[in-house]
Amino acid sequence: MLKHVVMCKFKNSASESAMSEVEKGLEGLPAIIPEIMEFDFGRDVLRSERSYDFALVSGFENLEKMERYRVHPAHQKVVAKLREICDSILLADFEH
């Protein structure tokens, strides 16, 4: 299985409504994109200075299915909204 990890730091100017809009968009992705096998996300609970504000971990059977997710229009729409409210986004993909 491939794991896809995303972490972001929100801009100081990011509104609660904008963050909630991204979360709502993410909630719908597993029903729209059948390639998603696992999908968990949430805001940081520790809120330490070193912590990122938001994380997402998703799982895919193989690289081809992860690529279909990556280019899916519904995913791209959420990514665009996430980029608007984040100062920094980190990505990691690994086999598990």
What are the language-model segments listed below?
Residues M1-D53, E61-V71, F94-H96:
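Short S/T/G/P-rich N-terminal loop/turn motif that feeds into the first structured element of a domain
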Residues R70, V79-L82:
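Short, flexible helix/strand-to-coil boundary loops that buttress conserved ligand/catalytic motifs
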